[in-house]
C-alpha cells in the first residue's frame, strides 16, 4: 500500500517514524500482544515481532508516496493490527494522505 506523501516530506516522515518505532521498542510496546524483537533501518524501517510477523515503511523512490507492507505468518487479524499500528503513527505526522488501496 502506498499513502500519498509529498516528495519533499517523505524522507523526513520516514525518519520520524524510525525514531518513534525505535523508542516504542525500548518501551516494550506490544502490537497484538507481540513485542518488537528486531528493527532494520536500511532504506526505511522494517520491524519484526516475536512470531515472525513484520511491518515495513519506506519512501517510494519514484513517486510522492510511502510504501507500507505488513505480513503475518499467523493470522490476517495480526496483519491488520500491524497495519493499524503503522497507520496510526503515520496519521499523527499530519503529512500523509490517502492510500492507493485498502488492506
Show where each model-derived region lies.
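Phosphate-binding and adjacent anionic-ligand microenvironments
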Residues: 1-69, 75-103
Amino acid at each position: 500500500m502506498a499513502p500519498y506523501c509529498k516528495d519533499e516530506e517523505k524522507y523526513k516522515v520516514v525518519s520520524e517514524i524510525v525514531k518513534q518505532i525505535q523508542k516504542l521498542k525500548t518501551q516494550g510496546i506490544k502490537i497484538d500482544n507481540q513485542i518488537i524483537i528486531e528493527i532494520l533501518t536500511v532504506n526505511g524501517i522494517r520491524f519484526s515481532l516475536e512470531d515472525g510477523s513484520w511491518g515495513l515503511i519506506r519512501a517510494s523512490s519514484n513517486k510522492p508516496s510511502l510504501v507500507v507492507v505488513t505480513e503475518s505468518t499467523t493470522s490476517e487479524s495480526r496483519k491488520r493490527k500491524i497495519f493499524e499500528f503503522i497507520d496510526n503513527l503515520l496519521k499523527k505526522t499530519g503529512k500523509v494522505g490517502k492510500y492507493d488501496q485498502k488492506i
